[in-house]
């Protein structure tokens, strides 16, 4: 079994464990690969129920984001990006309930994300796809909310 597959299985197990602890229903949800692939091609929601949201995202560089109640697990499947977490947001603005955005951040920890990488971002932590040299980065976002 390839390392990337092992990492995805380990992360999925962790997410299911965390989700169960947060009160997310423990019912089985099956999504066939063709729907997952179609969703990844355009971006969108794969699963959305009671505190657990799984998205397929395809994007370029963006703004700094903070989500008050959302914990993220990002699983990179294509492309590469410079990703920044933490630091102090420059001129933050509330853009929706529980969500703050800014154009940049001072300080923070920088990571170079590529295919097969997994990164977790706790709620209330600034995070930013600062640079995407491949023009787009594709990833699954597993979002857990209380």
PLM region descriptions:
Residues 112-117, 123-146:
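Ligand-binding loop in jelly-roll beta-barrel domains
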């Amino acid at each position: 079994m390839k390392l990337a597959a092992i990492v995805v299985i380990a992360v999925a197990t962790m997410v299911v464990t965390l989700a169960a602890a947060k009160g997310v229903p423990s019912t089985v949800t099956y999504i066939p690969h063709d729907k997952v692939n179609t969703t990844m091609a355009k971006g969108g929601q794969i699963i959305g129920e009671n505190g657990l949201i799984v998205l397929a995202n395809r994007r370029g560089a963006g703004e700094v984001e903070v989500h008050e109640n959302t914990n993220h697990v990002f699983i990179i499947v294509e492309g590469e990006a410079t990703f920044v977490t933490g630091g102090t947001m420059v001129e933050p603005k509330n853009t929706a309930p529980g969500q703050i955005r800014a154009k940049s951040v001072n300080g923070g920890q920088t990571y170079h994300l590529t295919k097969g990488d997994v990164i977790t971002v706790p709620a209330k932590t600034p995070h930013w796809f600062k640079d995407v040299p491949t023009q787009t980065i594709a990833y699954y976002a597993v979002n857990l909310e209380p």
